[in-house]
Curated annotation (Swiss-Prot):
The gene is xseB. Keywords: Cytoplasm, Exonuclease, Hydrolase, Nuclease. One of its GO terms (molecular function) is exodeoxyribonuclease VII activity. Transmembrane segments: none annotated. NCBIfam families: PRK00977.1-2 (NF002138), xseB (TIGR01280). PANTHER family: EXODEOXYRIBONUCLEASE 7 SMALL SUBUNIT (PTHR34137:SF1). Its EC number is 3.1.11.6. Belongs to the XseB family. It is found in: Cytoplasm. Bidirectionally degrades single-stranded DNA into large acid-insoluble oligonucleotides, which are then degraded further into small acid-soluble oligonucleotides. It holds the Pfam family Exonuc_VII_S. This is Exodeoxyribonuclease 7 small subunit. One of its GO terms (cellular component) is exodeoxyribonuclease VII complex. It comes from Streptococcus sanguinis (strain SK36). Heterooligomer composed of large and small subunits.
Amino acid sequence: MSKEKKFEENLADLEVIVQKLENGDVALEEAIAEFQKGMKLSKELQASLDKAEKTLVKVMQADGTETEME
């Protein structure tokens, strides 16, 4: 992937994959491939959320108004 996708684009892609798998009308091989893509997207989304949370914590702590989020 030469250009990093935005969080919202990755989330939309994951939602499409989940919908496909929930419908159950895909071949086993395709379902496995889609599941793997979904897991990769899920990890990327979680990493993006973790990074955003750390950024917010730093900003809030620099202001002196907030402590570490859990």
